[in-house]
């Protein structure tokens, strides 16, 4: 093999190795972003109708609750102890709150809480006083949501929050903040 052919072969090999290395770095960066910073979730189910509907893809940030606590009204990703998967709900009750739901009205610490995002009235009245490090999460579709009113989800500790939903990214016709 001539020197010229050998040099061409080495150059192609170096270019290929450079390309593979760049691809591996890009994959590693994407995985780190997915694992620690951002997540895309496809909505399945009706519990957050009409805010989020089946088929919506939402962008969630995973770092929001590293340095601060969930706030009332946040749409959040949660993991429920003993249940598989990630759920999307809205934070309604904070530690120490008394939450009363009567029909289509919600009261927090005896004051009416306006919820323009709720699509229908609750399936039943509900009263709870939250303890220290307890949060109440509910779906916006109060009649059909499986949420903090149900014993298998219940009141959640702060470490159950895995991220905050920021916007709908798909379908494009619904693109925007939540």
Feature-to-residue mapping (PLM):
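Soluble "head" domains of membrane/secretory-pathway proteins
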Residues: 2-17, 32, 36, 41-42, ...
């Amino acid at each position: 093999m001539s020197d010229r052919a050998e040099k061409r072969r080495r150059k192609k090999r170096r270019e290929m190795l450079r390309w593979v290395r760049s691809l591996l770095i890009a994959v590693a960066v994407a995985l780190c972003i997915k694992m620690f910073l951002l997540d895309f979730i496809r909505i399945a189910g009706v519990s957050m109708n009409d805010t989020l509907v089946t088929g919506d893809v939402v962008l969630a940030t995973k770092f929001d609750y590293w340095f601060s606590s969930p706030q009332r009204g946040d749409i959040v990703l949660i993991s429920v102890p003993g249940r598989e998967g990630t759920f999307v709900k809205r934070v309604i009750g904070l530690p120490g709150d008394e939450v009363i739901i009567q029909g289509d009205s919600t009261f927090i610490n005896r004051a009416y809480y306006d919820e323009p995002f709720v699509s229908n009235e609750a399936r039943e009245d509900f009263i709870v006083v939250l303890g220290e490090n307890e949060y109440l999460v509910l779906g916006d579709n109060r009649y059909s949501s499986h949420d903090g009113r149900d014993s298998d989800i219940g009141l959640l500790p702060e470490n159950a929050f895995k991220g905050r939903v920021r916007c709908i990214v798909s379908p494009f016709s619904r693109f925007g903040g939540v």
